[in-house]
Amino acid sequence: MKRLPDNLFVSQVSIPGTHDAATGNGVTLASYSQCQDIDVATQWSIGIRAFDFRPKVKGDYLNINHGIAVTNLRFDDALYLLRDSLKEHPSEFAVIHCLYASGYDSDKTKYETMLRELLSREDLKDYFVPFRRDLTVGDMRGKILLLSRDQYAGKPITGGFFQSWCGWLDWNAQSSCSIIGESAASDYKSPLWVQDYANTKDSEGGVAKKVSAVTEMLEHSTKHVTKDESDVVWVFNFASAYPGSISMANGYRENATYTNAAIIEYLQTHEAGPTGVILMDYCVDRSPNEVDGKYLTRGRELVDTLIANNYKWLERRNKTVYDKALERIDKLYEQLQEAQESIATECADVAAEFEDELAAAKDVIDQQKYEIDSLYAGWLFTESYTVDYIGTYRIIRQIEKDAEKAQAEFDEASGIHAVQAEYIGNDCQIFSLTGERLDALRRGTVCIVKFPDGKVRKVVCK
């Protein structure tokens, strides 16, 4: 994430994540509950930045479980691992999807007390960030955003709460979820789109439905335009599912061979755009984690594809905004050139007086050109960026008007009247200043005109 611009909304980042991340550290009932082949530390090292942790009370501490299956990773150890990883890599950040493993109601009081204590520890609390809809990459660097599906307190101790979570295939429901932070203010609440269709039994064509659900969410997320914080939408798109009547490790593996591949193919064949958080099973290319593993899960390839997608999208967005901005800059340079030529020919007697103003107008355009070049180089453009075309054009036009007025005043003071050629009729007599009879006015030169009423005036043809 080091190369991502600080002003980028976190909601616009494609974040690779792991479903039931801690099962890679070892888990009981592994043939039913395992979803990862590598431990959380290794997941971090390959680029995973979102982690699905399911804590559960175990004696006097919180362990991470997958349902009733117990992993070999305590929740506090997982948080300290992420803290230490962020210390070592302060340009990164981590997102946690947190859900109590099972039996929440029976453990509610104890769990809530233990979780509050853990999140408030002196050696951890400064590494958490409160949720806001407009969190940027700069806000998040070196931090952990913990988002809980259990409302363990009246308001989040840190991070935020998911609301109206949707685990079925209904776009109205999937797009009606939200995340709330510690305040009731609007900037602490964000729309959330969720795809978490998990039970994909073959007898019901569930695998095809799951793949379709994943790619349909990608259609929504990658095409969504976030011009400013009012457009922010967070997205959680679960690649995880199991194609059977009960969850099995090999079921998760089999599903991963379809969903991980579908996401890779989509991102390789469609215009790049943000995916939000993608939570996958088996973030390795073959599972079990062996060269000749049976299941071609392509998880590591998916991680790399999601990371690369950030830069493909930023380049596309950057180029689109830059090209529009550059087109306007070029037009301003044209307007300035036309003004310079007009003043030089039509206001020749006073043109020198406006050289500094024209140079200042050029400086304004040059500065805007420098700004867009710098923004482009740093991938700092946003969809709402615009060049101040109208304001700069008005500056140029005002210089022209001032020059025209100054020339008219000069002509008046010199006894010379500026006229349009068509105002001099055929019944007028035209002479040069030396008295030579002329057939017509000469543009830009002073002539003497004798009108039918007998009046004689010095005029300059404009």
Language-model features, listed with the residues they occupy:
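Long, acidic (Asp/Glu-rich), low-complexity accessory segments flanking structured domains
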Residues: M1-I46, G59-E88, F93, A153-I157, ...
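Conserved, mostly hydrophobic/aromatic
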Residues: R54, I96, L146, I278
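C-terminal outer-membrane/trafficking sorting elements
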Residues: T345, D411-K462
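Active-site groove signature of glycoside hydrolases
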Residues: P90-D105
